[in-house]
Amino acid sequence: MELLLLSNSTLPGKAWLEHALPLIAEQLQGRRSAVFIPFAGVTQTCDDYTAKTAAVLAPLGVSVTGIHSVVDPVAAIENAEIVIVGGGNTFQLLKQCRERGLLAPITDVVKRGALYIGWSAGANLACPTIRTTNDMPIVDPQGFDALNLFPLQINPHFTNALPEGHKGETREQRIRELLVVAPELTIIGLPEGNWITVSKGHATLGGPNTTYVFKAGEEAVPLEAGHRF
C-alpha cells in the first residue's frame, strides 16, 4: 500500500499544504486522477474545499474530483488512482463515509494500489479507529471503526504544551486514559509538521519534530525522522 499521513495541513509562514507538496509529488509515481473526500470540512462547503484542494494540486498535474459531486461515488472510488481525505472534524468525516458506503471501497482501492493521502482527520481515518482524534464529537458516526489501512493509532497535532494557568489534561494524559481502557493499542503522537509515509511495505516517519509512541504501562518513546515502524 501507498499512504501519506500528515499531522496537519498548514505550517507557520507557509501556504496551505505547501510543506506537503514535495511529499505528494514523490509518491504520485505517475498517478494523476484523484477523488477528494471533503466531508470533514464542517465550516466550509464541499465545493469550496474541493476547489481549494484542486487548485493546490494542479501544478503537480493532479486532477481532483469531489466525491460529493459524482453520481456514483462508489464507482468513482473504485476507479481512482488517488484518494485524498481532507482534515476537519473526524466524527463528521466518518459518519458521512459510513452512511454513503465509502469505507470498504476506499480500503479496497488502496489495497489494490491507489495512493491514499490524508491530513489530520484524514490521517485518523486511515487508522483502525478514530479513537485518537482531538475533535469534538459533534455527530454520532455509529461506531469508531475506520479504514484500518495503517495498523497503529495516530494522534495528529500532538503537543503536550498547556497554556500558562490552564488546568485541563495534557495530551499525554488523555492518551493515557485511552490506554487504561484499551491497553492493546499503540498510539503515535504525531506533532504538526510531521508525517508518516507507507511505501513498499515500510512505514517511515518524516518531519522536523520529535514524535512520541505511547503504550500501556511504558514510558513514551521519542522517535525522529527516518524511523521505520
From Swiss-Prot:
Q: One MF term in GO for this entry?
A: serine-type peptidase activity
Among SUPFAM superfamilies, the record links this protein to: Class I glutamine amidotransferase-like
Q: What class of enzyme is it?
A: hydrolase
State which Enzyme Commission number(s) the record gives: 3.4.13.21
From the UniProt record, list the coiled-coil ranges.
none
Question: GO annotations under biological process?
Answer: proteolysis
Q: Which CDD domains match?
A: GAT1_Peptidase_E (cd03146)
GO CC field: cytoplasm
Record localization: Cytoplasm
Q: List the catalytic activities from the record.
A: Dipeptidase E catalyzes the hydrolysis of dipeptides Asp-|-Xaa. It does not act on peptides with N-terminal Glu, Asn or Gln, nor does it cleave isoaspartyl peptides
Q: Which domain of life is it from?
A: Bacteria
Keyword Transmembrane helix attached: no
The active site consists of: S120 (charge relay system), D135 (charge relay system), H157 (charge relay system)
A Pfam family: Peptidase_S51
Q: Which UniProt keywords apply?
A: Cytoplasm, Dipeptidase, Hydrolase, Protease, Serine protease
**Gene3D superfamilies per the record?**
3.40.50.880
Q: What is its main location?
A: cytoplasm
Q: Which InterPro entries match?
A: Class_I_gatase-like (IPR029062), Peptidase_S51 (IPR005320), Peptidase_S51_dipeptidase-E (IPR023172)
Q: Does the keyword section mention Ribosomal protein?
A: no
Q: PANTHER family per the record?
A: ALPHA-ASPARTYL DIPEPTIDASE, PROTEASE S51 ALPHA-ASPARTYL DIPEPTIDASE
Known role: Hydrolyzes dipeptides containing N-terminal aspartate residues. May play a role in allowing the cell to use peptide aspartate to spare carbon otherwise required for the synthesis of the aspartate family of amino acids.
Q: Which family does it belong to?
A: Belongs to the peptidase S51 family.
**Can you name this protein?**
Peptidase E
